[in-house]
Amino acid sequence: MCDGGLPGFISDPQEYTINPKENSVYDVIFYTGFTYRIKLCTKNTPAKLEFNLVDEKGNTQFTKNIEAGFFRDFEFDTLFHGKIIIKPLDSSIKEAQLLIGYKKKKKEN
């Protein structure tokens, strides 16, 4: 479903299948010193979804209405405990998947 995967990143082996009929919520922990790539894919494109990254206190750190194929890189200065919340905005979505990958952050000179 996610053609090309996450080149250059180590893929999280857990499968994150998105429920196309309701919100999907995933607990995540992100560590300092890494770059994380999050990618959303659907079988039918373009499909619209809302992506939210929320910290453990419920504060929204990032939100965006997106289309399938979206990816974004994140880096964290401190240990991040939170949730990824995916809201389907398109009733035509049949199958959707979330990929999370990581790689060691390059050291700055």
Features from the language model and the residues they span:
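Transition segment at domain starts
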Residues: 1-22
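Acidic, Ser/Thr/Pro-rich low-complexity intrinsically disordered segments
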Residues: 16-97, 104-109
